[in-house]
Amino acid sequence: WQADSEEKYMAGVMDKWKALAVPRKEFLELIRGLEGWAGVDMSKRIDLTADAHVFWLPDGRLAVTAHGFMPEETATKHEHTDRVPYKHWAREGWCTLTPGSVTDYKFIANHLDEFEFDNGVTILEECYDGHQAWHFMQEREAAGKTVVEIRQGAQTLSEPTKYFRELVFQGRVVHDGSPLLTWCLSNAVEVVDSNGNIKLSKKHKDDSQRIDLAAAVINALVRAMVNEAQPDVSEFADEQFLDKLWG
């Protein structure tokens, strides 16, 4: 991958993104009973790790939520380096601080299972970067989940990365207002190659401007795009119009 240019991924659309938030309770009511996709972004066990869930609503909008995980013992250090309130966000339910000094992946598995059960949703596929999460993927598959490896190259990631931003620009996204996901999106840098392909990156490899929750959303969207439903326009149109529309 040879980058030709870099700029902020959500430049010019962060205000739109923030305006598309709804209260958490309202968000969960929107997705109840739907089928969706999960994405997971696994980092080093001492850093931020994330899962995300995306759903196509009947009106054609994409519903997006994401959750972070971090070791409890490193949270204070990361609050100083990253300059964000992880412990406060954990109390508000936007992330989970796992006991000890490394992230216990059992908490991620439990969160994926509980999210599906508690909200009455059906997760069709769990999407992973196989390089980082191979063992975890095998465990999830053994538990009966459908897992998909998402290759982290330009051909796989460019289109969904562009499409997500386009959906935000069009107002076709709804989310639960997670300050952690919003922070990750605001940090993400768009790396463009000579063919115009893009992918998300941090500004520097060891940068504290983390993007993990945004990366998890894109992993899920790779598969959700393959299965994008046509919006249900029946509530907006009469039968005569629908007959013409669908032939």
Describe the predicted segments one by one:
Residues 120-132, 136-137:
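Short glycine-rich phosphate-binding loop at a beta-alpha junction
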Residues 221-247:
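Acidic two-metal-ion nuclease catalytic site recognized across multiple nuclease folds
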